[in-house]
Every structure is written in structure tokens, then in C-alpha cells.
Swiss-Prot record:
The lineage of its organism: Bacteria, Pseudomonadati, Pseudomonadota, Gammaproteobacteria, Alteromonadales. Keywords: Ribonucleoprotein, Ribosomal protein, RNA-binding, rRNA-binding, tRNA-binding. HAMAP family: Ribosomal_uL16. This is Large ribosomal subunit protein uL16. The gene is rplP. InterPro entries: Ribosomal_uL16, Ribosomal_uL16_bact-type, Ribosomal_uL16_CS, Ribosomal_uL16_dom, Ribosomal_uL16_sf. Belongs to the universal ribosomal protein uL16 family. It comes from Idiomarina loihiensis (strain ATCC BAA-735 / DSM 15497 / L2-TR).
Length: 137
């Protein structure tokens, strides 16, 4: 599963997920993409589940790019532990997703196959997504 090799700080503030995606909002590498239309958090497990669903559907043909990386640690205190005594241990890693962010890209497959693969990947995610194609300018 994806997680940073090393970080400057072990734990981070909760923060707020606001605004629209300023970067990573265009299809850059492939021909087709899966774009978030809602905001939320995408865990490393969800990223991997989506990748597996797409890879299995296209039968390992074409190329898939993962455009998000889980770089935010989420902490959790153990069960039946009283409040206080510091922040809990890092439980898992998430990527914060804003509307407009391209999550996955695909190339080398027909559009119908890509659409179906992205639909299967979108079922694994906790927010709404849409299918996008590369715009040539």
C-alpha cells in the first residue's frame, strides 16, 4: 500500500478540506481519466482497491496512472482508552481530494473498456466521480 517513505513530522493537524483542485485537475498522461466531483478523503486501501479493479477489468492491457498519493497520516487511539494522554498512533494514510482532482488515468484501451473500468474503480470510492477525456489544445 502507498505511504510516504519518511516525513518531516509524524502527526499532523486535522485541518479542513476546502476549495477546488488547483493542480492535478487535467488529464496529463493518458487519454481517459477519473475525476472527483465531490470532496473527501481517499485512503491508501481505497486507492489500491480501485487500481486492482481497473487492472483486472482491462486484463492488464494499456497503461494506468495513479495521480493521487496518500501523504496525510490519520491517528486513532486504542479501544477503551480514556480521553487525553496525547494524540493516538498513526492508523492509516489518506489523500485529501478536492472537486476537480484527476484520480486515475488510462491509455492504450478503447473508450468503452476504460469507462467500465473507471466505473468499477469509482464503486470503491467514498465520493462522486466522473469520466473525462484528454482535451487537445
Amino acid at each position: 500500500m502507498l505511504q510516504p517513505k519518511r516525513t518531516k513530522f509524524r502527526k499532523v493537524h486535522t485541518g479542513r478540506n476546502r476549495g477546488l483542485a488547483q493542480s492535478g485537475n487535467k488529464v496529463s498522461f493518458g487519454t481517459f481519466g477519473l475525476k472527483a466531483t465531490d470532496r473527501g478523503r481517499m485512503t491508501a486501501r481505497q486507492i489500491e482497491a480501485g487500481r486492482r479493479a481497473m487492472t483486472r477489468h482491462v486484463k492488464r492491457q494499456g497503461k494506468i496512472w495513479i495521480r493521487v498519493f496518500p501523504d496525510k497520516p490519520i491517528t486513532k487511539k486504542p479501544l477503551e482508552v480514556r480521553m487525553g494522554k496525547g494524540k493516538g498512533n498513526v492508523e492509516y494514510w489518506v489523500a485529501q481530494i478536492q472537486p476537480g482532482r484527476v484520480l486515475y488515468e488510462m491509455d492504450g484501451v478503447p473508450e468503452e473498456l476504460a469507462r467500465e473500468a473507471f466505473r468499477l474503480a469509482a464503486r470503491k470510492l467514498p465520493f462522486k466521480t466522473t469520466f473525462v477525456t484528454r482535451t487537445v489544445m
